Amino acid sequence: RAFFAPAAPRRRPEKHAKGSDTMELFRCPVCGAPLTRGARVLVCPKRHSFDLAAEGYAHLLPAAQMHAKIPGDSREMVAARRRFLDTGGYACFSDGLNALVCSLLMELPAPSLVDAGCGEGYYTARLVQALRASGKTPSAAAFDISKFAVKVAARRDKAHAVQWAVASSFAIPVADAAADCLVDIFSPAAAQEFARVVKPGGAFVFAVPGPRHLYGLKEVLYERPYENTVQDVAYPGFALEQRIPVHSMLTVTGSTILDLFAMTPYYWKTPRSGAERLASLDTLTTELHFDFLVYRRAHA
C-alpha cells in the first residue's frame, strides 16, 4: 500500500503596502540607520522595525515620542481641512508656495524636499507636481504627527510621488544634511532639527499667518478682533533672506464656513457666543494674508 504525504497548505501571497517604491529619505527614528523596505515593514540593520500601513505610509513615531494617546489633529479636524482645501480656498497660497520653491530649486535637476508637519498632504502633493512640471525629478518626504492626516495624504497619493510617515518635527527621522529644501506650513518650527536636516546652503521655507489673516472671521467670532503677531524669528544656523507676503480675499458659504473655522486654532478658544454667530451665517468674506519666510542654511 502506498502512503502519500498530505499536500502542503497553500500560502497566500504576501501583500505589499502601497506607496513610494523607496523610502530613501527616511531613517530609523531609534538609531538613525538606513531603512530597508519589506512587504509591510521597514527594518534597519539593528533590527528596529516599523509598520508600513496598507496605504503606504510608515509609522516612525516611537511610543517615547508620543505625548498623547492619539497625538496631532483628530479625524474630524483632518476631514474639515480636506473638504475646505478641496474647494480651492487656499489655492492662491499653494500656488505662491509652488512658485517660490521652484525658484529656490531652479538649478537642481533632482532636488530633495522635506515637508515638516504636512497635514493631509494638500500642499505637498501640489508642490511635488509643480516641481515635476518644471522638469525636475524630486525626492520628497513628508510627515505629520497625526496618523489620521498622513493616512489621508498617502491614500490620495495615487502616483506614489511622496514618501509619507507619521513622525515628529522634534525628532525628524531623516538623515543629516538630506534636504535641499524643507518647508513648514503653519506648524511649530523645530529649529535645531531643521538645521540638522537641511543641507549647507539649502533653504528652509516657513509659512506663517500674516497680521490680517482671517480677520473677517475674527470679526464674527470676537467682540474685539485682533491682528496676528508678526513673526520674524532668528533661528540658529539659518539666515533670513526674505519675507514674501501673499494677500487675497476669500468668500465661503454654507458648511464650508464651519470647515474653515474647524481648521483654525480659533476653533479651540472661541466663546460659544462667537461660534453661534458664525454658525448662523450663510456667507463669510475674509482677508487672507500669508507670509513666506525664506531662510538659508549656513555653509559649514
Predicted regions and their residues:
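Class I SAM-dependent methyltransferase SAM/SAH-binding core
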Residues: 112-115, 120-171
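Class I SAM-dependent methyltransferase Rossmann-like catalytic core
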Residues: 67, 72-96
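Conserved beta-strand signature within the Rossmann-like core of class I S-adenosyl-L-methionine
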Residues: 201-211
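A short SAM/SAH-binding and catalytic strip from SAM-dependent methyltransferases
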Residues: 179-193, 208
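A short acidic, Gly/Pro-enriched loop at the edge of an enzyme's catalytic core
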Residues: 170-181
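N-terminal auxiliary segments of SAM/dcSAM-dependent transferases
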Residues: 21-70
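Conserved Class I S-adenosyl-L-methionine
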Residues: 246-300
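A short glycine-rich, Lys/Arg-flanked "PGG" loop and its adjoining helix->strand segment in the class I
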Residues: 191-203
